[in-house]
Amino acid sequence: MKVLFTLAMIVVTLCLGQRMRRDIIDDVCNTCEMSCQWVIANNGTTVCRIPECDTIAAFCKSLKFNMSECMEDDSFIQDHCIRAFLLAD
């Protein structure tokens, strides 16, 4: 019985951890979008006027088309997005 309880707690902890990470990704992308002042660079690309935000901004823009997928409960997609988020940092 103790083993089952321990396994259940591990599963709950992992699920909560994934949800928190998704919330972090969502918050970072939303904050970036709101605080970024977009400008068009000489080469025609759109960049963020705030240098610290530029890397995250690029990440968020690349995620924009599938951000809703990142919020779904498909652990493969979540894991992929979380890894991309950590690499973009």
Swiss-Prot record:
Top-rank taxon, per record: Eukaryota
Keyword list, A-Z: Cleavage on pair of basic residues, Disulfide bond, Secreted, Signal, Toxin
PTM comment: Contains 4 disulfide bonds.
Keyword Secreted found: yes
Cellular localization per UniProt: Secreted
Signal sequence segment: 1-22
Principal location: secreted
Expression across tissues: Expressed by the venom duct.
GO molecular function: toxin activity
Gene Ontology CC: extracellular region
Domain notes: The cysteine framework is XXII (C-C-C-C-C-C-C-C).
The family this protein is said to belong to: Belongs to the teretoxin C (TC) superfamily.
Protein name, as recorded: Teretoxin Tan22.12
Organism annotation: Terebra anilis (Auger snail)
